[in-house]
């Protein structure tokens, strides 16, 4: 009888531990499309000696690396300085059957404008897109300590026509000297990338 109880106890322990041992990270295996805005002859916003296209690409590369570390399958719209149409960006995400679409940008405006904002569009996967935008925005503001300009709805092409939850993050204002100093820093770019991935993690953890 003692042996029987010991066997039952061991079986119970094994059943308790098995789900933990086998549990995968929620993001593991997900295909996440990372879109570095602009590129090539399209420099995007320009300010304080910086080009938006370069910042977008640098952050995108850090995001891609971090996603790989977490077992996701990141797909980048571009890995170098070349031009892609908006239609090509959306088509590539669809061709790769992406689970999420995250477009990375920096903003421009009057010199006093600063801060971070994240956009979604509600026509397709609206609630999931809003939730993803909220999670990424929250992580960006917390990590970067930027002014929180909020989560907003807009009809940017890439988030309107992508057939999966889609967001567009504006990391800061290239035309604001304080924001620009940070945006041009590799350390800050890495922090922004980590925050974006943490936002994606939060989205899948819910």
Curated annotation (Swiss-Prot):
Keywords: Hydrolase
Domain MurNAc-LAA: 32-201
GO terms of molecular function: N-acetylmuramoyl-L-alanine amidase activity
Coiled coil: none
Lineage top rank: taxon: Bacteria
BP GO terms, sorted: peptidoglycan catabolic process
InterPro entries according to UniProt: MurNAc-LAA_cat, N-acetylmuramoyl_amidase_3
Family per similarity comment: Belongs to the N-acetylmuramoyl-L-alanine amidase 3 family.
Protein name stated in the entry: Uncharacterized protein YqiI
């Amino acid at each position: 009888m003692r042996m029987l109880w010991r066997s039952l106890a061991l079986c119970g322990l094994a059943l308790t531990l098995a789900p933990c041992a086998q549990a995968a990270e929620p993001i593991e295996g997900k295909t996440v499309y990372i879109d570095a805005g602009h590129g090539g002859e399209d420099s995007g916003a320009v300010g304080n000696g910086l080009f938006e296209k370069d910042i977008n690409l640098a952050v995108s590369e850090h995001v891609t690396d971090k996603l790989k570390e977490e077992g996701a399958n990141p797909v980048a719209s571009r890995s170098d300085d070349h031009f892609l149409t908006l239609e090509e960006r959306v088509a590539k995400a669809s061709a790769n059957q992406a689970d999420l679409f995250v477009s990375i940008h920096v903003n421009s405006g009057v010199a006093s404008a600063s801060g971070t904002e994240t956009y979604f569009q509600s026509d397709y996967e609206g609630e999931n897109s809003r939730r993803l935008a909220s999670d990424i925005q929250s992580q960006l503001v917390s990590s970067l300590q930027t002014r929180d300009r909020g989560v907003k709805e807009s009809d940017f092409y890439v988030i309107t026509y992508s057939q999966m939850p889609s967001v567009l993050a504006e990391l800061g204002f290239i035309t604001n000297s304080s924001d620009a100093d940070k945006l041009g820093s590799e350390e800050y770019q890495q922090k922004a990338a980590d925050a974006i991935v943490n936002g994606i993690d939060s989205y899948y953890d819910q």
